[in-house]
């Protein structure tokens, strides 16, 4: 699945949205470290990245050629500022119609429409891949993201009051959402 588009962010900057490929491994690793270190809304901590560069590059190459999965990047000039992607929930027939969506945007770029553009691109890619349902989990306190998801047609279908546990011992409620495509 291929994607390549330029958008204008709310700050007037041109942002290039494109597929990740095997050569983006280092930049994606750096983005992971930054985004996962500056907010508690994401699934993991910076030190929990489980892929080395070789493994990450292999996975990115596979995703770049996949007909039903995609990893998209947002670049401000040559600076990687966000990533988003979809992948199937599973390979069994009974769940083959469902995909999961994930996204991370550098905090300095929140509120500029970049997350929305990546999400809309992923929704279109999910439709093109033949999925009929797109799913995500979001921390309940992340009201900006939840509002964006609602506007895109996602609906809440469940809550887990102890969905995430932080290293401080506190819990975060996680909202499960889905959109019919």
How does the language model describe each region?
Residues 135-138, 150, 155-172:
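Conserved catalytic-core motifs of GNAT/GCN5-like acyltransferases
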Residues 119, 126-137:
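Conserved GNAT acetyl-CoA-binding A-motif
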Residues 109, 113-121:
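Conserved acetyl-CoA pyrophosphate-binding loop and the N-cap/start of the following alpha-helix
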Residues 11, 30-47:
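Helix-loop element at the rim of GNAT/NAT acetyltransferase active sites that forms part
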Residues 15-27:
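A short beta-loop-alpha structural element at the N-terminal edge
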Residues 48-108, 180:
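Acetyl-CoA-dependent GNAT
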Residues 1-11:
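Short acidic N-proximal helix/loop "leader" segments that mark the beginning
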């Amino acid at each position: 699945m291929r994607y390549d588009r330029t958008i204008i962010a709310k700050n007037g900057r041109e942002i290039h949205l494109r597929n990740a490929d095997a050569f983006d491994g280092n930049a994606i690793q750096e983005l992971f470290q930054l985004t996962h270190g500056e907010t508690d809304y994401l699934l993991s901590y910076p030190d929990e990245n489980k892929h080395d560069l070789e493994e990450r590059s292999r996975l990115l190459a596979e995703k770049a050629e996949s007909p039903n999965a995609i990893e998209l990047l947002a670049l401000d000039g040559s600076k990687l500022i966000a990533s988003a992607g979809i992948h199937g929930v599973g390979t069994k027939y009974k769940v083959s119609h469902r995909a999961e969506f994930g996204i991370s945007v550098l905090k300095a770029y929140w509120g500029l429409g970049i997350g929305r553009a990546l999400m809309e691109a992923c929704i279109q890619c999910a439709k093109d891949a033949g999925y009929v349902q797109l799913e995500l989990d979001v921390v309940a306190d992340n009201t900006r993201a939840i509002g964006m998801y609602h506007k895109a047609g996602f609906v809440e279908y469940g809550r887990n009051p102890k969905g995430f546990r932080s290293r401080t011992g506190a819990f975060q409620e996680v909202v499960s959402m889905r959109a019919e495509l």
